[in-house]
A protein has these predicted regions:
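Active-site pocket-lining/capping segments in soluble small-molecule metabolic enzymes
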Residues: 1-111, 115-262
């Protein structure tokens, strides 16, 4: 809803979790928003799961014909299994690599170009100097979002209290009192553990622009409506007070963007 209310002239792509396929895409209010975005020239993508094991392959295999007819421009994938699954079935829409399908150097970019995949997400492990050497003018750069520190089939809820078959979020705390958020995806039986503080490069905007990324990604995972609105205002509203307030409202990190060469 917050994206629906934003001016679309500055939005190039919207990527939605694949779970909207089969539920949300059939709902009128979601269809209305999709129609609005597409008429505004916004590209629409579905994001594939972090783990693409046999159960995911079976589900997507059963749904592939309907899935392939969705009003989308392509998909964002996070693993090789999803790539080969799509290629084996002749998927001919755009494929975008997420940041964990590493492209550290020109050899990596060339490999994927040979696979007819040219859109990628800049690796989170590289700093600004390394990103400049990589050349991300044909890639996306994550400028806001929580990072998965672990993706695991070892379900925390199942281990500690038994499987409830209900997806949700648990808070973990380590010996240094740092918090992590564990989201369990029961439909495909895996966990994603996120950092408490998201990456936020808004204060580095001039340096981000010097890299000329094709897209600047704002990635939402655990945010509620109010938090989402705050983040969007921080990036889309040019009023300096709004930008400053957005920075104060959220604890954040700049990730590896300012770090020295590893």
């Amino acid at each position: 809803e917050e994206l629906y209310g934003q001016g679309t002239q500055r939005i190039g792509r919207i990527a939605l979790d694949f779970r909207l396929f089969g539920t949300g895409f059939s709902e009128t209010h979601v269809r209305d928003r999709i129609d609005f975005w597409r008429k505004s020239g916004v590209e629409l993508y579905l994001v594939f799961p972090h783990i693409f094991r046999e159960n995911a392959q079976e589900w997507f295999g059963r749904q592939f014909e309907n899935f392939n007819q969705l009003p989308i421009d392509g998909v964002v994938i996070r693993n090789f299994e999803a790539f080969f699954f799509l290629k084996e079935r002749g998927f001919d829409k755009k494929i975008i690599l997420d940041h964990n399908l590493y492209i550290f150097n020109q050899y990596g970019k060339e490999f994927w170009k040979q696979q007819k995949v040219e859109d990628f997400t800049a690796p989170l492990e590289l700093n600004s100097r390394e990103l400049r050497e990589l050349d991300i003018r044909d890639g996306e750069l994550l400028v806001y979002g929580r990072i998965p520190v672990m993706v695991s089939a070892q379900c925390i809820e199942r281990t500690t209290s038994g499987c409830s078959k209900k997806s949700g979020v648990r808070v973990l705390q380590d010996r240094r009192d740092e918090k992590f958020f564990a989201r369990n995806y029961c439909d495909l039986c895996y966990n994603v553990i996120y950092t408490e503080n998201p990456i936020n490069l808004r204060q580095e905007w001039d340096r981000v622009n010097e890299l000329y990324p094709k897209m600047r990604r704002i990635q939402f995972t655990l945010e509620d409506k109010e938090q989402t609105e705050t983040v969007l205002n921080t990036f889309f509203v040019t009023d300096e007070k709004t930008v400053a307030r957005g920075k104060e409202d959220t604890d954040f990190t700049t990730g590896h963007f300012n770090r020295g060469i590893i």
